[in-house]
């Protein structure tokens, strides 16, 4: 038997809150060992836990013992999808895993990953972080040539393109596929005896390589290595394909070099603070953003507080630079999932109080600087400011560690509709008035560059409209493969 799909249909619904944060597409993880008794499923499970912040709609993994392929995926958090009994059934020395937030295709079990397909190379499994901007034309061409699709995700387009190159060896087939893909993609792929990692030629999404004894690990973020006791080796380069099998590790490269364009939101919001991405620690980068914000802030205040959790590092940097004391003024309910993960609006309108609670003794009669990472729609910001005033804050000054988001993202962030972006149609003063802050300070693009790295190495299209990967008609629709 080549394949067993374990799938208990135990559906789980997460109720999260309306938010002002953009949301990430996915997290991917892979592990390879030559040891026959290696427990790839347990390591993949822990790795996915470490990447849970990158997606909470579904989780899944595929493992192989070198001969047989086993898989399990379902809707919900990693802890809801897997248990000890399931993991013990998933025996293998090679594995890949995925946590998902939908940016192309609905939040459905059919779109949960990894996706699997039987082709000339055996069973091929793929997990994808990113978003294609040309999936419709690729899918139409595949359908005209006989491909039948079971999902509405762009990942199935990728796996069908690879399968079409049946005469080529696996790395060549994947590289040929990558040459026609337009958009953002960090992939982990698996056959019954091989693990592969591929990062798109712009390096728009992170992907890194680690090692645990003699086992190789591939992950969206380096924080997953620490969780399993592995050591970080290096970031996978833009346009690089890494193949791991019994012969060891080999690298292949896409033929045409592209300008590096890592998504700046990996540093601002998406990545865990203990991750390092392309040589920069996320926590330290956010502290640097806070120092730059403090230089711009012209008001006076008694206390600096973060919106938990991603505002914390920035608030520390702001406080250190400004001399204004740092404190905790909002407590986050640890049993409420990350803001904005569930994409349907009716799940966002439950209000902010169940998630955040003010510490009145810190706020009463104080001039408060509150640090947040982004303002997308402006909805939650206003509610938080109202919450602080009700707790006794005398003044509330909002400082944001990202510039105004004025343009949609088509590369894997769920902000592809321009009219949803408050800064696309309103001035800073209009937004300040809308959220009822005493002042509103956005970090400038120049300040963001100073905090991070040269502008030539970052994608900031959502701030300046400079799209490094051309977008056909500059039109985004996460349900584009469900229409027609």
What are the residue ranges of the model-derived segments?
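Generic beta-strand/beta-sheet core signal
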Residues: 127, 190, 198-199, 210, ...
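Phosphate/diphosphate-binding loops
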Residues: 176, 224, 231, 239-240, ...
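PRPP-dependent phosphoribosyltransferase catalytic core
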Residues: 178, 193-194, 229-235, 386-484
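Short, glycine/charge-rich flexible loops or terminal/linker lids adjacent to PRPP-binding catalytic cores
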Residues: 323-368, 379, 406-413
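Conserved short alpha-helical segments that host acidic/polar catalytic motifs at enzyme active sites
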Residues: 2-238, 243-301, 307, 395
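Flexible loop/turn segments at secondary-structure boundaries
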Residues: 103-104, 134, 204-205, 225-226, ...
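Secondary-structure transition/capping motifs at alpha-helix termini
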Residues: 147, 167-168, 298-302, 320-327, ...
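A conserved beta-strand->alpha-helix junction
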Residues: 151, 156-159, 326-337, 434-452
């Amino acid at each position: 038997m080549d394949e067993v799909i374990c799938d208990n249909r135990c559906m789980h619904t997460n109720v999260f809150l309306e938010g002002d944060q953009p949301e990430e597409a996915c997290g991917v993880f892979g592990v390879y060992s030559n040891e026959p008794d290696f427990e790839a499923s347990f390591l993949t499970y822990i790795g996915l836990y470490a990447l849970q912040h990158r997606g909470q709609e579904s989780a899944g993994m595929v493992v192989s013992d070198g001969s047989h392929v086993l898989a399990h995926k379902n809707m919900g958090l990693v802890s809801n999808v897997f248990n000890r009994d399931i993991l013990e059934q998933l025996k293998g020395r090679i594995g890949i895993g995925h946590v998902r937030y939908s940016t192309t295709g609905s939040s459905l079990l059919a779109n949960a990953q990894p996706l699997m397909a039987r082709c000339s190379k055996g069973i091929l499994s793929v997990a994808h972080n990113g978003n294609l901007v040309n999936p419709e034309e690729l899918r139409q061409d595949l359908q005209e040539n006989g491909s039948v699709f079971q999902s509405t995700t762009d990942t199935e387009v990728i796996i069908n393109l690879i399968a079409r190159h049946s005469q080529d060896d696996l790395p060549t087939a994947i590289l040929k596929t990558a040459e026609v893909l337009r958009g953002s993609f960090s992939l982990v792929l698996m056959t019954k005896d091989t693990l592969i990692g591929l990062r798109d030629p712009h390096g728009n999404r992170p992907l890194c390589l680690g090692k645990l004894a003699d086992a190789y690990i591939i992950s969206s973020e380096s924080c997953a290595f620490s969780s399993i006791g592995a050591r970080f080796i290096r970031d996978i380069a833009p346009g690089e394909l890494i193949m791991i099998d019994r012969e060891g590790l080999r690298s292949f490269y896409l033929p045409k070099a592209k300008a590096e364009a890592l998504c700046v939101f990996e540093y601002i919001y998406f990545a865990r603070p203990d991750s390092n991405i392309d040589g920069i620690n996320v926590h330290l980068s956010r502290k640097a953003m806070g120092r730059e914000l403090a230089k711009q802030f012209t008001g006076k205040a008694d206390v600096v507080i973060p919106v938990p959790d991603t505002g914390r590092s920035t608030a520390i940097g702001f406080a250190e630079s400004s001399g204004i004391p740092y404190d905790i003024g909002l407590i986050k309910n640890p049993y409420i999932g990350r803001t904005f993960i569930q994409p349907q609006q009716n799940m966002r309108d439950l209000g902010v109080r169940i998630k955040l609670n003010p510490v009145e003794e810190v706020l009463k009669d104080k001039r408060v600087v509150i640090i947040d990472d982004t303002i997308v729609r402006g909805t939650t910001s206003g509610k938080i400011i109202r919450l602080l005033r009700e707790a006794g804050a005398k003044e509330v000054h909002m400082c944001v560690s990202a510039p105004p988001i004025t343009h949609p993202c088509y590369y894997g962030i769920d902000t592809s509709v321009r009219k949803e972006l408050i800064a696309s149609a309103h001035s800073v003063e209009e937004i300040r008035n809308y959220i009822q802050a005493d002042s509103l300070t956005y970090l400038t693009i120049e300040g963001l560059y100073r905090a991070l790295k040269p502008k030539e190495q970052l994608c900031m299209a959502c701030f300046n409209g400079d799209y490094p990967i051309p977008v056909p008609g500059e039109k985004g629709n996460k349900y584009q493969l469900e229409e027609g």
